[in-house]
Structures are given as structure tokens and as C-alpha cells.
Amino acid sequence: YAFLLLHQHPDILDDLRTEHGQVCGLNRQSILLALQSRPRLLNDLKLTHAVLKETLRLFPMGPVLRKCPRVPSEMIEYEGRTYDIRNHIVAISHNSLHRRPDLFPDPDAFNPYRFLPGAVIPIPADAWRPFEKGNGYCVGQELAMIQMKVMLLLTLTEFDFQPKYARKAARGPDIYGGYAYTTGSGIGPTPAGGLPMRVDKRAK
């Protein structure tokens, strides 16, 4: 989904490539050499990190299921309503949480700048949680973010990506991916049709 969103927002893609060039260099070889000698440079890719966080906000991973333990009341109250939670499993809807306008202004917009340090409107603690929190926290979160940063670095410096769905393909709402609307029942968001793309080598 990151490639799709960046294709739809070329101004953000330009800013991202500028950051890559300033931090690690303008070609694959310079990037590899820079990361081998100074892997901490990945920490300087603030916009890259923000792009990944915003992508995961809009297209989050599957929820963590939590089985409710037996409690004395076995009932909870939420927004004036009472729920019986005996022997139930509770799941957090990340899609709903991540698109709340009180937590993320203009929630349907792809705006990675909201995640940059010093953003005008700070994001409340625990509002962004595609890797979940507490006992359900994903221990591989940091590794996953590092891998995705390196992937964007090495691909965007050399290639352009353009979605290429057939005209007869079913289309969903643009805010949920358009032709690449989320489908399937796996742990992560699966684009409809596999998100076919045309990949072009960038001119030097």
C-alpha cells in the first residue's frame, strides 16, 4: 500500500526521495555502503518512518483478540451501555480507531507529516497501534519497521511504481484503496486483486 499511496501523492514521494538522497545517497550502491558503515542512519529517515506509520494507520494489520477473564461483575459499561463479557473475545477495530477525527484530523487523508517530530497537532498516546500494545504487543515491530525502511530506500531510488488494474476490475471507495480495497481475512490487509503494478526503471 505504501507504493500505491506514494504514487497517488507525487509531492510526498518527491520529499521522500529528497530525504533518501540527503541521508544515504542517490543510488543503490551509495545506500548500501552508507548503511553498512553507519546503520544508525536509518534513524535519520524521519519522513520515511512517518510514511510507513501513516500507511499502517490507513491499512493496519489485523486486530489482537483478547479473551475476557472472569471478573466479579462480568459486565462492562461503555458510552452508557452495559455489555455482558462472560466467555467473550474482544477485538479492537484498528480501522475505526485510526480513522477517528478526534485522534487524527482529516483521518481519510494520506498525511505522513502528522507523524513528524514537532507536528502542530500531536497524536495522542496509544492512538496509533497497528502492532498493538500491552501483552499483545508485537515483539518484531522494530525489525519490521527497519526492513520496510530499507525496502523503500532500495526500491524508490531506482524504480517508479504505478498500479495497473484492469478497467473491468471492481472498485471500492478511494479512501479504502479504490481498486486496491482491502479484502481477505488474513492477519494483514490484502489488496483486492493483489495490487498489480507496472514497475519502471527510473532515468538517471
Curated annotation (Swiss-Prot):
Similarity section: Belongs to the cytochrome P450 family.
Record's keyword terms, sorted: Heme, Iron, Metal-binding, Monooxygenase, Oxidoreductase
Cofactors named for this entry: heme
Organism from which the protein derives: Penicillium crustosum (Blue mold fungus)
Alphabetized InterPro entries for the sequence: Cyt_P450, Cyt_P450_E_grp-IV, Cyt_P450_sf, Cytochrome_P450_monoxygenase
Pfam family, one: p450
One record GO biological process: mycotoxin biosynthetic process
Documented EC number(s): 1.-.-.-
Broadest EC class assigned to this enzyme: oxidoreductase
Protein's name in the database: Cytochrome P450 monooxygenase PC-23
Gene3D superfamilies, per the entry: Cytochrome P450
UniProt-recorded Gene Ontology molecular function terms: heme binding; iron ion binding; monooxygenase activity; oxidoreductase activity, acting on paired donors, with incorporation or reduction of molecular oxygen
Role: Cytochrome P450 monooxygenase; part of the gene cluster that mediates the biosynthesis of the indole diterpenes penitrems. The geranylgeranyl diphosphate (GGPP) synthase penG catalyzes the first step in penitrem biosynthesis via conversion of farnesyl pyrophosphate and isopentyl pyrophosphate into geranylgeranyl pyrophosphate (GGPP). Condensation of indole-3-glycerol phosphate with GGPP by the prenyl transferase penC then forms 3-geranylgeranylindole (3-GGI).
Pathway the protein takes part in: Secondary metabolite biosynthesis
Residues holding heme: C138
